[in-house]
């Protein structure tokens, strides 16, 4: 007798990523697992009284997306405090959003824009000025983080953090000052971003009960974008077990809607080995459940190995003592069979790290232990081969989609063509998983990352890659699903819609496999299923949606700006995509003025009369 399904989805285009059965019309689910995929008639044989049957009406279905490098646990604690500029088409819009939020934000709270945007996404192609931040929010502290390189603080924020003429510059950072020595509000990473993160940490925090709400809101936003799993990369100011209280509470109450495998990130420079000795006594890799489980160490193993990825600054040279410190930690991890990950941007750093790994491997064989580099933008073919020889992998994120213009400015157009060399990694048969590295710099939107991989373009539209380093859509998707599963040692358990695998899937708003490249960025989920249960539904599927979770506190930016900017309805999407390709060049078909003149103007965007052009009329939106 066949197993009875609790949920059947039918009449769809189901891309299973199962090579034995790649395309199906229907899928049957029971007990949180895939029972079978196939034709409507075959799958309906698993139906019985009480089976929920959903008509997909031809929608495309894919396995749930899995971000192999996301700072979800930390990001969730702060999500309700942050105004998102991801995908916002103009600086004028961004500043208007900021002003509206400043007007709603009670003292002593801040308005924070923390990552996910680039000035090149804006029609104006520039960052806000400090004057514009002060005009938008004269009394409310404002903190705007730009990539890994700088933060902009208005006068109220400078007062809140206490930076004055007497405040010294921290090591690796600069407080920009005026001619009298007073801080202007600009903080620069040179190249250490600690000045940025330490300043952000001075802001008010949500109480624990609201951190619960914030984390649930963040997971629901990720579900809206089709994410069902993530590998949490730890982070600064995220100590274990103290800062895991909220996520463990949600796990205990069955309120998680994104599966998390978590890595532990050392918090104490020069005491890293002590951190990992304590944690290896507390946890075993894989300990937990399919929703929340320990994954190993990293992405920070020792602070001396951190090669900061600020392409506005020269490549940093790691200190001479790095190898000895890294060897002690890696030796301990391998002895305890703890998987590990390590942040590494530059090939020069990777070469030295691999020297350490090879030395340890000669004494204590890695022997199938899962380990991997994160990022690896400039890794060479020779070092990819060394990674493979040690059984390692490479987790790649879309940081170049946000920093590509700066990389070209420093290293040139030829150098960027294989930064990172994803196609070469695949050619050499090294495990590759994809992700975002959100939330402090890049966007958490997986479709921005898929667009980058497929098109080879930045969020500002700059073409970086030739065809030989762009990925076919099916390959890019597989790396976002089954590919990422390797990095939490869950290959064969998730990432494909095949019998016995976890029932995590996404019904898409558009057909990823056929829409124009520019439309990939606007894809989202209309139905997300995790563990066989609906965790998000929209549009035609809205009646299936779980109950809404009210956003708290009531002044939270998420109330008015619920996450990533949403693109125009399908009828207008083609026009919007065209504008992004052409960067607002040419004349307005309605008024006849020249958009490109306005785009390149340095006139403040608040001066609407002088700035008549792209932003002086409604045509800029099209």
What are these regions (language model features)?
Residues 250-254, 280-292, 364-366, 387-391:
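Acidic (Asp/Glu)-rich catalytic clusters
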Residues 76-80, 170, 255, 289, ...:
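Short, solvent-exposed loop/turn segments at the edges of secondary structure
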